Amino acid sequence: MRNLQSNIGIQYTAIGDTERRGEVVSYHNSPSPAFLLKATTDDVNGLSESDKLNINSSGLFAKSKFAIGFEVEKTRLRRGAVMEYALFKGFEYDSSCGYEAITHVLPLVGRSMWRTKVFNMFAEAKHIIDEQYSPSNHKCGGHMTFSVDGMYGHQLMDLIRPFSGIMYALFRKRLANRYCCENIEMASNFGYEKYTVCKINDHSLEFRLPSRITSVKCMMDRYKLMYAILDFAINKPDARLSKFHRAIRPIILSMYEGNVEKADAILGLAVHFTQFLKTGKIDKYTCGWFEGWTSSRYGSFGSLRAKYSRTFRPIGCQQSSLNDFKARYEILL
């Protein structure tokens, strides 16, 4: 990502209002985020007509209707890299993995100069984000909080549910993680419980399911995917799943470094998770991921039997069910 030198439009720089933005502080005690949702009309030049639906414009200024924030969890931060960045609101100690860097509230926009400027902030923070500089491990997560202007969290949950099967497929190995395994149906009336797949807040949602962010490219791909999910949820809620999958396929291919076989396997699995989110019934395609059959010899076999579909009866033939599951998803294990 190039270093933008243009003086046209919005400029993202460190705020400089407190030294604490460049220090690691105790959990939940980093400074408040800035809401970086406004730009100029110069920044939205190049947006497609459909992407302009997600922007409010008034005179020379524009405001994103969609917003997103990331948590970047690490076991260690590169020496000398902890400082204030335009991207991060601050750094905190985290008891589960060590440290986390938390972004400001960012505009979630389509392909444009504005998006390029957001991605440039990611690149400027590479010594925090990239694994080669600041490592992480399996205990680290990649939580994402997102919102739509004027919408309550529970309303947004109902809208994104039909397009969230891809998140389950991508982060399938975390579906049995105790920190993000509740409310697997993404019910909008579940309340404000924390350890859910997608936590409901008053005016936002937090996907807790994603795994750790390991690179700037990883963060960019997730940004693009979340934009696509919200764009379909808000503007094309009745779109066929096949149309949505065609739209996100280039992003999934990028996530898997162009591996067509893996990308198509993920999209295929997403179809089954989407069906689960529609019916609430677990079947042979999804059970192993929900019950964690890949995390140990047996995982939590049978723990979700109350949600099994009528035609799915693995109880009593445990080993053969495990073998069939592992054979079916060998490429994704």
Task: Name every feature range the model reports, one short phrase each.
Residues 2-136, 149-333:
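C-terminal accessory/tail domains of diverse enzymes
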